[in-house]
Amino acid sequence: MTARFRLPAGRTYNVRASELARDRQHTEVVCNILLLDNTVQAFRVNKHDQGQVLLDIVFKHLDLTERDYFGLQLADDSTDNPRWLDPNKPIRKQLKRGSPYNLNFRVKFFVSDPNKLQEEYTRYQYFLQIKQDILTGRLSCPCNTAALLASFAVQSELGDYNQSENLAGYLSDYSFIPNQPQDFEKEIAKLHQQHVGLSPAEAEFNYLNAARTLELYGVEFHYARDQSNNEILIGVMSGGILIYKNRVRMNTFLWLKIVKISFKCKQFFIQLRKELHESRETLLGFNMVNYRACKTLWKACVEHHTFFRLDRPLPPQKNFFAHYFTLGSKFRYCGRTEVQSVQYGKEKANKDRVFARSPSKPLARKLMDWEVVSRNSLSDDRLETQSLPSRSPPGTPNHRNSSFTQEATRVRPSSVGHLVDHVVHMSPSEDFVSQRSPSSTQANSIVLESSPSQETPEDGQPPALPPKQSKKNSWNQIHFSNSQQDLVTHTNESFDVPSSPEKSTPNGGIPHDNLVLIKMKPDENGRFGFNVKGGYDQKMPVIVSRVAPGTPADLCVPRLNEGDQVVLINGRDIAEHTHDQVVLFIKASCEKHSGELVLLVRPNAVYDVVEEKLESEPDFQYIPEKAPLDSVHQDDHSLRESMIQLAEGLITGTVLAQFDQLYRKKPGMTMSCAKLPQNISKNRYRDISPYDATRVLLKGNEDYINANYINMEIPSSSIINQYIACQGPLPHTCKDFWQMTWEQGSSMVVMLTTQVERGRVKCHQYWPEPSESSSYGCYQVTCHSEEGNPAYIFRKMTLFNQEKNESRQLTQIQYTAWPDHGVPDDSSDFLDFVCHVRDQRAGKEEPIIVHCSAGIGRTGVLITMETAMCLIECNQPVYPLDIVRTMRDQRAMMIQTPSQYRFVCEAILKVYEEGFVKPLTTSSNK
């Protein structure tokens, strides 16, 4: 049949073209994309196209080079779990409702270091994302950090502070955090004045550098339910999977510890590695709202693991039978990994590009009226298609007069209760069965609404976790069944001891309030092997923060688990006792006649599964490929376990939280000698004094010097590294310093500061210039040589005792690369320096003298680092907090700031991962 026929007037009508035009109109859809500058751009695409087509159009519109960090998130998803547009699936299968479709352009993968982003424009997009997330309460932020971040944002937009232009109230048109306090602007203005000279790019870089330290930075949350029908949050991030309940982080599962992630129907499973001290595999199970939410979480885990942990994505199945006849999902992340993205950025990025920044708009993304946007977007002149040329990033009109407020729940500690991940003892015949009454789920914007607060916010703090969407549906209690027998009566049991029910055990479940009685005795060193955090003074329940492998806490039955809440200690209610009191109660158990510690805990309920598999294999599973780190020192179990815990603590922030809780001065230690009138002038700082019990005594009538002995014993070896930690000499204490050096027989001095930093004298020059000699009382010091590099200096000296007519050779090593403020950006130079110190002291028994300015901060960092290296060489686990505690037992305040502690922890992890120091077959050398 021909498509053309002749009309009487001699004209033609093209039927086929009309049919195609009609079909094209039916298959083209409009997609409204909310960009990070709060503008909406409409694009027209074919609904049969893959998602990658729409992504490419958006990337082209933004002229974005480093694309793999970003994605499109469905704005009108009806679940509480965010869904990303899959680039490999047709658009019509992902966007079910009618056109126009609404999506948010967002950062999908948050890098751990902004230096990995090669283009300033990419960092600007990150900056917009985080700023918006903090403003809407999606990303919680302490007020002091929020003020710092806001000051960098102001510097980026307004430039340098100008007293004549930036009058009082110049920030009144801006909103930075939910429920912004009245004095918040003053704090921002004060910090803004300190950023003079920073360009917009530098200010934004500093913004990202500060934001990456936030607890919830880069965490993608998915809502789930526990066995008691309580809400929990499952967070997916670069380092692994987090579990939150009642706004308290309950568990962290690093990719290092995960063997497999899978799901079946509405059940999501995490299978953990079997450790050497464990007898059974561990399988964790979680209930999701529906099948799609479960698969969404699973895909998020696959994508995050592949992007951050692998060098390249796994290749697709090439075998015909393996591809078409295997059960489960064939989904694989196929974009670039972080390693590939960084390399691509280095090769393709245009670091000199110029773009226009958008002025701030206080309106939040959640206030976007998608209905109005949808109506406006249907106008043809507002559409872009893939045929349009690329544009420069769109500008934005100034709307500073707008205002934004948002209800936010106040951050409050909560009783942890028991986190029922419903991990249960299960035989192969058992299966998960969940039941739910039919219900509807309210459609909401992907930007989560804040739930009504039960308390009036007092401090303007944003919520600790993303605010929960309101929902109409309600979930019924989830039951587990074994054949015809209902197991609901057993769901409150806290531990399933593998013995006959007739036999009683010394430990076991208490029927009331789901409590568990745990008994243990200390090891030969008087330790139980667990740490706790919280207390009445911290307004937090007392929670078990760490259980060391192979210790009494780990081996007792029932086992004490991380996340368990301690209710009673030896029958004593600790609800109104401080953290230090709780620790003393635990330690006092070692001194009692029975020597037994009895704990009543509300369990975290992470239990082992008898069998690895269910009745049938899960429908979808993902077995993470091993990253290079996984294969390091596999045989050194205890050492490897401690490194995993350290990496986990750095990611989650528990490392710094535990450091903050550690006493700065050991209880019961006195410092009376330092406060005697004749000694006060010998202290560089009024509040930094040596313990009386461990101070170095000089011979003679005036025996005082601000210095302490510090001995660090390395277990399973004969090594005891001896140090003298002291302050940097003052002009009138140089004689005392050299007297101490002579009397202690020290042949090496380690100096960790320059003489002047930021205009302040940190240490007097207590040695002569090269080829010169100087006298200090009865001691003459001659400097023979001075060599070095930009990071450190070696000086060879002779110390001559004029009274005894004796001389000794000594070496001074000075580290000069420590910045005036903060800590080094890279630990490489410092680690080289520590290695040189170790080489110089090899075979020497006498103590080495270590000092900075106060003799506590950088001095503590060096001692911690060398101790950790020795522990690694001896195949011993490394727990930095224990090292700091040992040092503070001998000199107060060792390692002065959290940034110093984080620096040394990261350096220890680097030494282990990169093989800087390796376990030795013998441990005779220091």
UniProtKB/Swiss-Prot annotation:
GO molecular function: cytoskeletal protein binding; glutamate receptor binding; non-membrane spanning protein tyrosine phosphatase activity
Subcellular location: Cell membrane; Cytoplasm, Cytoskeleton
Keywords: Cell membrane, Cytoplasm, Cytoskeleton, Hydrolase, Membrane, Phosphoprotein, Protein phosphatase
Residues that coordinate or bind substrate: 820, 852-858, 896
Phosphoserine modifications at: 474
Main location: membrane
Keyword DNA-binding appears in the UniProt entry: no
Bias type Polar residues, positions: 398-408, 432-455
Role: Phosphatase that plays a role in immunity, learning, synaptic plasticity or cell homeostasis. Regulates neuronal cell homeostasis by protecting neurons against apoptosis. Negatively regulates TLR4-induced interferon beta production by dephosphorylating adapter TICAM2 and inhibiting subsequent TRAM-TRIF interaction. Dephosphorylates also the immunoreceptor tyrosine-based activation motifs/ITAMs of the TCR zeta subunit and thereby negatively regulates TCR-mediated signaling pathway. May act at junctions between the membrane and the cytoskeleton.
Name of the protein this chain belongs to: Tyrosine-protein phosphatase non-receptor type 4
Organism lineage string: Eukaryota, Metazoa, Chordata, Craniata, Vertebrata
Gene name of this polypeptide: Ptpn4
